[in-house]
């Protein structure tokens, strides 16, 4: 964050003229341990700690103002910014700060693939100038303002991920960020328990248009039936990408899966035909790459430079990260999971070159009433994925195991991380491959920690 006057940063939260013009803000924090002279401390009430208990101490440590939901003992009225909703305060400050700078910005949302698409878009743009992106899971009403406050006078591009669990959230994020280009990767069933239907999820994702200017490109997946039939706002310019239809603005042809990535021919009706290779597995990642390409080129970046950037893409966390360990190939994809991403991962894995295929699949969380049906469908998909052995973990994944076993798949349900790791260690051989996928809350990385440690001990 670069220095900004408190009056500009707090506009909309305080009456005009109530903040002395000479007061400067050097940072904004919600963590009392990070309070420094010149900062604004935002108090959030929490289950374990209430930030209001640290507001007075924050002023002692140099904070110029504290944002609080109510008057706090020890905090002078002239130092308190009263706001009943701390998230709203963060969003207002993020929007005010962002308005001081003019990077070319891409906003990314969608039910599946938005984080990977964000990473790919960052890779596509980074070669053209200083670029920032959303880090980790900072894609909500607390994290996105923090990302906006990382923009500086030298920032040329910004890639902002926008997540949501309820209608209206992306509208607020988009209006604060004001991207130049929007991306919607696809419409799945994540958060369907909150929104009721995929049609409503589609409407919620389209809220990104609220922050797009007149004539802005909106990059959309032509292969998604909900997006294709959606009524788009008149002020945006759709840019369609597809893996199946050559009539789309940008499509992928001759798609091939290799041992460490995907290759394909990219046909852009506006800019020509190019050969592309990405270090990411699966057709779904080809779609993510097309979305990133569309956004970067419609911002005016040269296609050749964009494609070079995509070839250097680096995945974050355990998202289809390929690890070679003692002769076994492990595809770590345990950061998140839903029915759409599970289907894509199994489709990728079925084409993965190896001796025998093993899968460790865990629960998909937050599916509400769809959970039972989704986990049974996962069992049917697993049975069609040429697996040598399926190991499941989690209460919901028991249904997956039952259905897969009934269809002839060699199946084992584990009740602990140790049991899951042992089941794999006892059965896997050099040349085999393992897909590990579940929702992040299932913590299947703990199985991998045991698995790798036991492999190492066996070698020693």
Predicted feature locations:
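ATP-dependent carboxylate/acyl-activation modules
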Residues: 108, 317-319, 441-448, 460
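Short acidic-hydrophobic, aromatic-tinged amphipathic segments that line or gate anion-handling sites
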Residues: 81-85, 411-420
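Phosphate-binding loop of NTP-binding sites
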Residues: 10, 89-222, 226-234, 426, ...
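Active-site beta-alpha connecting loops in nucleotide-dependent enzymes
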Residues: 46-49, 316, 334, 338-407, ...
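Residue-level signal for inorganic ion chemistry
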Residues: 9, 39, 58, 93, ...
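N-terminal leader/targeting and accessory segments in enzymes
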Residues: 1-92, 351-354, 380-381, 385-395
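Acidic, Mg2+-coordinating active-site environments of NTP-dependent enzymes
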Residues: 68, 73-77, 183-330, 354-355, ...
């Amino acid at each position: 964050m670069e220095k900004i006057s408190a009056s500009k940063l707090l506009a909309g939260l305080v009456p005009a003229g109530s903040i002395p013009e000479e007061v400067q803000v050097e940072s904004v924090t919600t963590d009392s341990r990070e309070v420094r002279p010149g900062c604004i401390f935002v108090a959030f009430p929490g289950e374990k700690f209430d930030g209001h208990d640290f507001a007075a101490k924050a002023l002692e440590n140099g904070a110029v103002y504290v944002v609080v939901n109510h008057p706090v003992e020890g905090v002078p009225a002239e130092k308190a910014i009263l706001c009943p909703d701390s998230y709203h305060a963060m969003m207002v400050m993020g929007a005010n700060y962002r308005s001081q700078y003019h990077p070319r910005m891409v906003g990314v949302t969608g039910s599946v693939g938005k984080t990977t698409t964000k990473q790919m878009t960052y890779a596509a743009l980074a070669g053209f100038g200083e670029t920032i992106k959303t880090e980790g899971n900072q894609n909500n009403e607390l994290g996105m303002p923090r990302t906006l406050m990382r923009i500086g006078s030298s920032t040329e591009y910004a890639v902002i991920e926008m997540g949501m669990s309820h209608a209206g959230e992306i509208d607020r994020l988009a209006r604060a960020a004001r991207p130049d280009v929007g991306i919607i990767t696809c419409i799945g069933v994540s958060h369907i328990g909150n929104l009721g239907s995929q049609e409503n999820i589609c409407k919620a994702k389209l809220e990104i248009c609220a922050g797009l200017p007149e004539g802005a490109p909106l990059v959309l997946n032509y292969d998604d039936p909900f997006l294709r039939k959606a009524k788009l706002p008149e002020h945006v310019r759709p840019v369609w990408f597809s893996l199946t239809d050559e009539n789309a603005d940008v499509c992928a042809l001759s798609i091939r899966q290799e041992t460490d990535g995907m290759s394909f021919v990219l046909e852009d009706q506006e800019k020509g035909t190019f050969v592309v290779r990405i270090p990411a597995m699966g057709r779904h990642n080809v779609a993510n790459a097309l979305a990133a390409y569309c956004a970067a080129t419609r911002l005016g970046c040269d296609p050749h430079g964009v494609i070079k950037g995509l070839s250097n893409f680096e995945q974050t966390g355990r998202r289809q990260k390929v690890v070679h360990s003692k002769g076994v190939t492990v595809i770590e994809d345990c950061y998140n999971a839903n029915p759409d991403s599970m289907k894509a991962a199994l489709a990728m894995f079925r084409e993965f070159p190896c001796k025998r295929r093993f899968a460790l699949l865990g629960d998909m969380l937050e599916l509400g009433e769809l959970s039972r049906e989704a986990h049974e469908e996962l069992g049917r998909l697993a049975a069609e994925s040429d697996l040598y052995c399926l190991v499941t973990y989690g209460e919901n994944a028991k249904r997956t195991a039952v259905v897969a076993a009934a269809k002839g798949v060699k199946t084992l349900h584990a009740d602990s991380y140790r049991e899951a790791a042992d089941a794999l260690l006892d059965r896997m051989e050099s040349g085999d491959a393992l897909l590990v996928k579940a929702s992040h809350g299932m913590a299947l990385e703990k199985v991998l920690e045991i698995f790798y440690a036991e492999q190492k001990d066996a070698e020693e």
